[in-house]
Amino acid sequence: LTENTQLFCVGDDWQSIYGFRGSNVSYIIDFEKHFEHASVVKLNLNYRSTQHIVEASNKVISYNKYKVEKEIHASKKSEHKIVVFSGNDSNDNLLFCVDRVRELLKEGIQNDEILFLYRRSKMYTPYFNRFRKENLHIQSKTIHAAKGLEAKVVFIIGLTEGYGGFPDIWLEDRIFQIIKQANHDLLLEEERRLFYVAITRAKDKLFLITEKGNESSFLKEIPETFTVKTSVALQPVVEKVITCKKCFSRLEKLWVICPYCKEEITS
């Protein structure tokens, strides 16, 4: 580059999910090493997702060591927690999701405001068939295809360990390692970034679907303060958390005054 060259780059290393296609997250992370006098502006306000979703996703991505440090804040407040459902099997998960979709539609949510995400298309086949049978046109995408998209309500299915889950078994794929030299830790971090991308597609409500006894290890990285867990498919899910109406801080049920802003708590 010459002295008069002007270079402008935009990117988010936290959403780098195409390493299997040859992309390299180091282009963003090490940008300042290659261009020492670069001026870096970090966009740290999330206008899409609620506070609980943003804080949960921040915690998940914090487990990655190789990243640009950022502190992302949410512009939206909400009482709704992230729902984690652990079914006994895939049929349990299907029943739970169908039941929740019916409830959401009754609440006034539109079909195109609900998005189902998954790693591989075949995971969604039973859901597609069920929704088609009930004449429900619900949006669905693979997580990679959903990058850049958003929806009021997001369901992420297939959050289990092993093949096709999170993290996926392809991390140990010998053919992949022949094509491209693979570092296990860095590939694991890309898997976590994929999970981060999935979580942050949700604007208002997020449902994480797993199987009892085979939960994705990434689910354990979300603090329980942001989630409500259930394993009964047709049981109403209490997914709200008490917050101060003035400062939006999380509160305990028995508090009568917000300890942060001294606002009186009313039911």
Annotated model-derived regions:
Residues 1-83, 168-169:
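Conserved RecA-like helicase ATPase core segment
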Residues 2, 36, 109, 203, ...:
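Short conserved AdoMet
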Residues 10, 43-45, 53, 81-92, ...:
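Conserved RecA-like ASCE P-loop NTPase motor core of nucleic-acid helicases/translocases
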Residues 13-17, 22-26, 46-51, 90-91, ...:
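Conserved nucleotide-binding/hydrolysis micro-motifs of P-loop NTPases
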Residues 24-27, 49-52, 56-61, 90-93, ...:
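Helical mechanochemical/support elements of P-loop NTPase systems and associated helical scaffolds
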Residues 71-73, 142-145:
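Short, solvent-exposed loop/turn elements at beta->coil junctions and helix N-caps
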Residues 110, 125, 135-137, 145-212, ...:
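Conserved helicase C-terminal RecA-like lobe
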Residues 176-186, 197, 204, 210-267:
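Helicase C-terminal subdomain and adjacent C-terminal extension
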